[in-house]
Amino acid sequence: MKGAIFDMDGLMFDTESVFVKAWDYVGDRLGIGPAGFMVIETLGMNLEVTKQKWRERFGGKCDEAEVERMTYEYIDDYYANNHVPVKKGLKNILDYLKGYRYRIAVASSSPENVVKAHLKDADIDKYFDVIMCGDMVAKSKPEPDIYIEAATKLKLPTSECYAFEDSESGLKAALASGCRTIMVPDLWQPDDVMRQKVAAVCKDLDEAAVYIDSDK
């Protein structure tokens, strides 16, 4: 194995809990009630697919543009006053991978400006050779496009890359791409079928680093 491709939200950073708070706030403001539960339904999906899920759930009860504006207003205000919450073991696994000369990429469904801002805020941007974001590919997770493109830019076949994911849609994308897929659960817990499909389920990124070391 020569490459490692990381999801971002819920995997490297505890950003999904911030989105739960944001959508509870937005739902209350728009009169539809707390909508943080929608985070589970849209885990790993890009902005356009997320909008589609909101349309399917709420129909004409809320204005799509207003939901987007208020969401990012809340998120921007949060990160203006707080650092991005880093997941346990992130720096450790990145140091481990760099020490063994792995090529490392991000494959996140979030927009490019958000991904780059979070990586810089956490002071880990220097670890990544490639950054792939949701607005760089035509098809969102669970389609495998973003993982295939990340591996291509790393100049590696997907079979030579680990993929690290926390969401169902992300896991489906990584598995379909041919990456050796490791799950680190966050808000969504895998069923027995998914557990059998992935290479490993690890409680955190420290445990994932131990798994990689044993998988040589």
Write out the residue ranges for each language-model feature.
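Asp-based, Mg2+/Mn2+-dependent phosphohydrolase catalytic module
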Residues: 1-2, 95-98, 111-216
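Active-site neighborhood of HAD-like aspartate-dependent phosphohydrolases
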Residues: 1-40
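Helix-loop "lid/cap" segments that line or gate small-molecule binding pockets
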Residues: 26-27, 46-61, 118, 150-151
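Conserved SAM-binding loop
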Residues: 12, 86, 104-107, 139, ...
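Metal-dependent phosphoesterase signature
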Residues: 29, 33, 54-92, 100
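Short beta->alpha linker loops
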Residues: 42-46, 70, 85-89, 110, ...
